[in-house]
Swiss-Prot record:
ATP binds at S92, T115, N161, G324, A325, S326, E327, G328, W329, K561. InterPro entries: GH3, GH3_C, GH3_M. Induction: At low level by auxin. Induced by methyl jasmonate (MeJA), red light, far-red light and blue light. Induced by wounding and infection by the rice blast fungus Magnaporthe oryzae. Induced by elicitors from oral secretions of armyworm caterpillars (Spodoptera mauritia). Expressed in green shoots, roots and flowers. GO terms for molecular function: acid-amino acid ligase activity; ATP binding; jasmonoyl-L-amino acid ligase activity. GO terms for biological process: defense response; response to auxin; response to light stimulus. It is an enzyme of class 6 (ligase). This is Jasmonoyl--L-amino acid synthetase GH3.5. Belongs to the IAA-amido conjugating enzyme family. It comes from the Eukaryota. It catalyses: a jasmonate + an L-alpha-amino acid + ATP = a jasmonyl-L-amino acid + AMP + diphosphate + H(+). Pfam families: GH3, GH3_C, GH3_M. Disruption phenotype: Open-husk phenotype after pollination and malformed seeds with low fertility. Increased susceptibility to infection by the rice blast fungus Magnaporthe oryzae.
């Protein structure tokens, strides 16, 4: 993409957002026209109408369970217009990391186009601040296994649905985001071999790399933790021009061997830089001197990885990628200079039809920083009707058969850009920890871990990763928090951490229940190093893609395999005494 076309993209964005209400009206009309024959819409009596008033009065708000019977028919091979006018030929699989069961979500060419619109917009603003010109991107991206459903529909992750399309590849060329690695590495049969070769290809093209990317911050941190373990092997491969025997997949070996040539000078340079680093601080700019930034989704459940990612990135800016889900895109990051913790997303009014359910916390019940699930809901409002400073749940209508679909995301309106809102992601609304009247979300858990981990700072330790579980086999039930640490901590410190975790859950339902002993003392369980990598491997064995993996912050009892992995890796256990028992 030239600077000129970046300007054109920004100008188009400015034009569309100046008249967001009209664009929303036109977008809904377009969606309803092309899907007028859909059984789902007809069942609710829409009758071909395309205006917002008729649409909202006929079609109810929904969650995935409501539309699952329709999608299951598509999975089973029903080619009639079930949720869209044209038959659905591809399905995306959501991650399924919490419950162990992925969801099927319809995918079509229109969703591909909205993806490219989102990417082009954020790239244009990014390139204005950090121009990259010609070059390559070190991308830790991975395809996943494709499955054919009973009805002959191709199902895979949303990212793989993109990577396998020629139109997507062309779009990535336009925005200077070509991956260093050949397709055979991206679609390799073994994640560990693909990761190794991503690192290798990145080093081979180290002078040409202008950006470092993965879908999620977790994948970036995992990549460089792996680099710490294999960097000497990578140097040997580059010095000798021979790919390590640990890469056994023929497709990967053949593709990477074509670009791997003996280069002792480069190997020596990498070796000297690595041994000169202090605890791997700034490894990314040291080895990729022309990289302008590190890019990926860094909000929500990815925030706990930012500290480690900043360590690897040194002085390079971290830029949070765009806001969306497998169900569809919402907004672009148009201010890449803002740190991830403060990032906002401008909603693109042409990529879907958006509504927002106003959420209010009961007066006096919640503290300012609590992300509790307690909310009073009002009727949904339109994109241009939201108010700055207020919080909402996002509702999306997309081009692929989701109508008034509740995403379950809580957002705050930070400001308006022209007439479209800029959203700040607050948390997933879904409940994580609950025993009786207590209600805590993923954000509450994250805040509790941040607070309790301060006790580790004196021993220069950090929480590498964490998750949680509700233990109901005892009476009363209790919260169980699992930590994987960077090293060994004393019993005294970990006991303090357990108490701090217990006290950090400030939801009134929790504190009241603890005081009257209807919830038992919180338990902190310490895990062996490598436990979360084992959970990742389990996820991959189910056909998931690492670029889609999110550590489950809460493990549902139905996810027995992950619970088994956690249980057999517990090395120490500490019960809170914060409430005196």
């Amino acid at each position: 993409m030239t600077i000129c076309s970046c300007e054109e993209t920004i100008n188009e964005f400015e034009m569309l957002t100046r008249d967001a209400a009209r664009v929303q009206k036109d977008t809904l009309k377009k969606i309803l026209e092309i899907n007028a024959s859909a059984e789902y819409l007809q069942n609710f009596g829409l009758g071909g109408r395309t205006d917002a008033e008729s649409y909202k009065s006929c079609i109810p708000l929904c969650v995935h369970n409501d539309i699952e019977p329709y999608i299951q028919r598509i999975v089973d091979g029903d080619t009639s217009p079930v949720v869209t006018g044209e038959p659905i030929t591809n399905l995306s699989l959501s991650s399924g990391t919490t419950h162990g069961k992925p969801k099927f979500i319809p995918f079509n060419d229109e969703l591909l186009e909205t993806t490219l619109q989102i990417y082009r917009t954020s790239y244009a603003f990014r390139n204005r601040e950090y121009p990259i010109g010609q070059g390559k991107a070190l991308q830790f991206v991975y395809g996943s296994k494709q499955v054919i459903t009973k009805g002959g529909i191709l199902a895979t992750t949303a990212t793989t649905n993109l990577y396998r399309r020629q139109r997507y590849k062309e779009g990535m060329k336009d925005i200077q985001s070509q991956c260093c690695s050949p397709d055979e590495v991206i679609f390799g049969p073994d994640f560990h071999q693909s990761l190794y070769c991503h690192l290798l290809c990145g080093l081979i093209y180290s002078e040409e790399v202008h950006s470092v990317f993965s879908t999620f911050a977790h994948s970036l941190v995992h990549a460089f933790q792996t680099f710490e373990e294999v960097w000497e092997d990578l140097c040997t491969d580059i010095r000798d021009g021979v790919l390590s025997k640990k890469v056994t997949a023929p497709s990967i070996r053949e593709a990477v061997s074509k670009i791997l040539k003996p280069n002792p000078e480069l190997a020596d340079s990498i070796y000297k830089k690595c041994i000169g680093l202090s605890n791997w601080y700034g490894v990314i700019p040291a080895l990729w001197p022309n990289a302008k930034y590190v890019y990926g989704i860094m909000t929500g459940s990815m925030e706990p990885y930012l500290k480690k990612l900043r360590h690897y990135a040194g002085n390079l800016p971290l830029i949070s990628a765009d806001y969306g889900a497998s169900e569809g895109w919402v907004g672009s990051n148009i201010d890449p200079t803002v740190p991830p913790e403060q990032v906002t997303y401008a909603v693109l009014p042409q990529v879907g039809y958006f509504e927002f359910i106003p959420l209010e916390k009961p007066i006096g019940e919640e503290t300012e920083n609590s992300a509790s699930i307690h909310y009073i809901e009002s009727d949904p409002v339109g994109l241009t009707e939201v108010e700055v400073g207020k919080i909402y749940e996002v509702v999306i209508t997309n081009f692929a058969g989701l109508y008034r679909y509740r995403l379950g995301d809580v957002v705050k309106i930070a400001r308006f850009h022209n007439s479209t809102p800029e959203l700040q992601f607050i948390c997933r609304r879904s409940l994580v920890l609950s025993i009786n009247i207590d209600k805590n979300t993923e954000k509450d858990l994250q805040l509790a871990v941040e607070e309790a981990s301060k006790f580790l700072e004196g021993e220069k330790l950090e929480v590498m990763d964490f998750t949680s579980f509700v233990e109901r086999s005892s009476d009363p039930g209790r919260y169980v928090i699992f930590w994987e640490l960077s090293g060994d901590a004393s019993d005294e410190v970990l006991s303090s951490c357990a108490n701090a975790l217990d006290l950090a859950f400030i939801d009134a339902g929790y504190t009241g229940s603890r005081k009257i002993k209807t919830i038992g003392p919180l338990e902190l369980r310490i895990l062996r190093k490598g436990t979360f990598k084992e959970i990742l491997d389990h996820f991959l064995s189910l056909g998931g893609a690492v670029s889609q993996f999110k550590t489950p912050r809460f493990v549902n009892p139905s996810n027995s395999k992950v619970l088994q992995i956690l249980s057999r890796n517990v090395t120490q256990s500490y019960f809170s005494t914060a409430y005196g028992f």
